[in-house]
Every structure is written in C-alpha cells, then in structure tokens.
C-alpha cells in the first residue's frame, strides 16, 4: 500500500511517498502525480518513508521525470532508503535521477529557478 502527501515549498512540490511503490499502485501514482504536474514543474520526491519499490515503481518514477523534463521542469529524489536503494543500484536507474541525502539539500539544488 502506498500513500502520497503533497506540500508546496516555494515553486517546488514535495511529494512524500509512504509505503510501497509497486505494480499494484504504479498506474495510480503516474496519474496522480501527472495531474499535479499541470501546475507544478519542479517536483521533489521525499522517499524517506518508501520501504519498497519494484520495476513498475521505477518505471512510474522515470515516467514522471520524463513528463517534468518535457515541461522544462525537473524531478529530484531525496532520502532514498537502503532497501529501495539496492533496486536503484542493480538497475542503474540512479544514473538518470538527481538523488540527495536530505530534503533540504534537494530543495537547495533547485536554486533560484524554482523560487
């Protein structure tokens, strides 16, 4: 089960993913986040509460990243936990995302463009 929490910080939409981002909820994730992309080009995914991800979940994150990039925006990740990090490492998906150790570091990386 997955829950999403949305917080606007300046021009950045912080999305906290709580639980498991897996096949059973990946389509819902894509639809929900895509809906928010209409008004928010800069996304920050706080993954501190995400305890599991599978290939469908990775695909959903990549999909959102591509949509954000197509709108001259960006999607960044923060607080990736050890178990999901293994999936990122094995698949080498970490190469296409900016991943930060903290939400504050990720927010700072958006710079003045997102303020």
Please annotate each region the language model reported.
Residues 102-115:
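A charged, well-structured terminal subsegment
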Residues 3-31, 48:
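STAS-typified acidic loop motif
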Residues 23-97:
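Amphipathic alpha-helical interaction surfaces in cytosolic regulatory modules
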Residues 11, 93-96, 102:
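Glycine-centered tight turns that cap/initiate beta-strands
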Residues 5-7, 78, 100:
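General small-molecule cofactor/ligand-binding pocket signal
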Residues 19, 81, 103:
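Short, flexible active-site-adjacent loop segments at beta-strand->alpha-helix junctions, enriched
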Residues 1-4, 30-32, 54, 107:
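Short low-complexity stretches enriched in small and charged residues
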């Amino acid at each position: 089960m997955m829950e999403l929490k949305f917080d606007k910080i300046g021009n950045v939409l912080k999305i906290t993913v709580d639980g498991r981002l897996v096949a059973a909820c990946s389509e819902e994730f894509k639809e929900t986040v895509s809906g928010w992309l209409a008004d928010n080009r800069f996304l920050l995914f706080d993954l501190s509460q995400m305890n599991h991800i599978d290939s469908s979940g990775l695909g959903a994150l990549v999909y959102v990243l591509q949509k954000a990039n197509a709108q001259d925006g960006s999607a960044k990740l923060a607080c990736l936990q050890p178990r999901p990090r293994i999936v990122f490492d094995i698949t080498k998906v970490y190469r296409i995302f900016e991943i930060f150790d903290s939400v504050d570091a990720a927010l700072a990386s958006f710079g003045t463009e997102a303020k």
